[in-house]
Amino acid sequence: MNNVKRTEVVSKRSLANEGTAVMKETYTLREVYINPEHVVCMRSDNLMKRRLAENLLPNDLDQRQEFTKIYINRGHAGLDITVVGSPSLIQNKMFETALEHKREILKG
């Protein structure tokens, strides 16, 4: 299998108070498996870095942590997700996984 396991930052919006139009956004972490063959591009997610500095993300994240927004091809529609880690770290993990997959195929 050539999927890469990462940690995704997931946002959930809800009403801050009953009867008001004020929205509250909370963040959680979850595992996600990404197929590197469907990744279109990756870039730093500075918005999540700001959210971390504002203490809006889960407490178990280090303040030095970086985030990457990954754009995934889904045919005529795309999907973008934010994962924990710098773009270079994420790319290295995807490259390593793709290389391991090719070695498995060559071994037969």
Positions of PLM-derived features:
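Acidic, Ser/Thr- and proline-rich intrinsically disordered linker/docking segments
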Residues: M1-V4, T26-I34, H38-G108
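Anionic N-terminal interaction surfaces
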Residues: M1-E18
